[in-house]
Amino acid sequence: MRLLVLGIVLSLLLSTKAAAEESPAVAPMPLYRDPVYDGAADPSLIWNPRTERWWMFYTNRRANVPDLPGVSWVHGTPIGIAESADGGTTWEYVGKAEIESPDPSIEEPTYWAPEVLRGDDGRWHMFLTVVPGVFTDWNHPRQIVHYESDDLRKWSNPRPLKLANDKVIDATLFKLPDGTWRMFYNNERDGKSIYFADSPDLDEWTDRGRAEGVGNRCEGPKVFRWRDKYWMVVDQWRGLGVFRSEDTEHWEAQPDNLLQRPGQGEDDQVQGQHADVVVSGDRAYLFYFTHPGRRGEAAQRDGAEQRRSSIQVVELQIQDGWLKCDRDEATQVELAPPAE
């Protein structure tokens, strides 16, 4: 009888251990911090079939560089790359993107908000915000530039896009059912409104004006399709605004924002900002960044602690027809390679 009981206990322990090993690990908080400048922001994720790893491209703000006046620390920024070998749970720095300047006369261009995708031609395409130099204020032109790559590391053939004006940022692209590419972006000269443009081939673009129903005073749009709806997530500096649509032309605003209330986790006790969304199977994951040092009495200071930023992740849910998430709930990330 004693042997039988021991056998049952051992069997239960082994089955519990096996189940634990099969379950995906919980993503750490923070998910990722950049080891060079400690300024990872504006994440954009893509599956790299050559390395069989998920890659994360991000704006690498120069948060830890001392004595940079004004907002010059947000300029002169490279595009960092991190990779994950375990489906998006943990990330390691693998360097920076090698980007050809659209204007060789610019000594130190600024790169922001990469949007990376695979085109119909099988090549990699990046739509990148480029600022012509390093500045201490926000009062300078910027443009969205189209790049191409064969390996996701070296980016060349820069072609600035002709959009609404000379101060546009933060492209996000989505392929419509008829094969048309639709790009949403932030028009800063029109009250930081969201505009959109269409292209049959990623090269020739027709600007379509404002996105109906989105309003203004936001940036960093991300558009994706999930559970029979089109969704747009934008950074409103009070968490993430959400909009839904049946056709990507007419948008309806969600009553409340995501990630407006601070979380409890490490580096997550502030609002969430500029996000990417990866849909994997029936699940969707929101990758966002935070400024952990901007809270309490220290929030108004301008030191390295207030400038640094971290990447976080949370799984999205749908409740009463709208997006919801619980940033304090453990997130098990399971990003599968996309279907070919």
Task: Name the predicted role of every residue range.
Residues 5-15:
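Bacterial N-terminal signal peptides
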Residues 20-340:
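Carbohydrate-active catalytic/glycan-binding domains of CAZyme proteins
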